[in-house]
Amino acid sequence: NPLLATSIINTGSSISARSQDGLGNYAFNYGIGNGLGATNSRAEFGDAAGNKKGSYTITDIDGRARRVDYVADAAGFRASIKTNEPGTALSAPAAAAIVSPYAPPVAPVAPAVAAPVVAAAPALAGAHLLAAPGISSYSSVIGHGAGLYAPGIAKTIFW
């Protein structure tokens, strides 16, 4: 198998670097490539004020590639993305072909709902008098246990 032989011989490579000063300014980067041609990398620079600028890239063995350049500062996070991934063209974002061994989802069947039946109100023979609400009052003592805790004290007090 030539593919297997290639992956055994070419295992890939990686590089990385980083630096930071006493003021909080920093920089780092790395790059990784495998023996089949896939790569990914990242680089970022930051300062003591919390501003960041960087990018990352990824390239797959089938040719798909993405690069993201970003800035994060007092104005927020902003990213610029460049890619050739399927379904991401501005002219036809939903045009990506989906290849799957599974059947597409089936829309649920909504049950038919009949209109509600409203019964006619009974006819009133005459006006009914209702008694005025009674006025009453009540009072009660309700006790709740509450734990009291202080250094050297641990008991329950009931009010």
From Swiss-Prot:
Swiss-Prot/TrEMBL keywords: Cuticle
Domain of life the protein comes from: Eukaryota
An annotated GO cellular component: chitin-based extracellular matrix
Pfam families for the chain: Chitin_bind_4 (PF00379)
Signal peptide: none
GO MF annotations, alphabetized: structural constituent of chitin-based larval cuticle
Keyword Transport: no
Residue span, Chitin-binding type R&R domain: 23-89
Its job: Component of the rigid cuticle of the spider.
PANTHER family (UniProt xref): CUTICLE PROTEIN, CUTICULAR PROTEIN 47EF, ISOFORM C-RELATED
Protein name (Swiss-Prot/TrEMBL): Adult-specific rigid cuticular protein 15.7
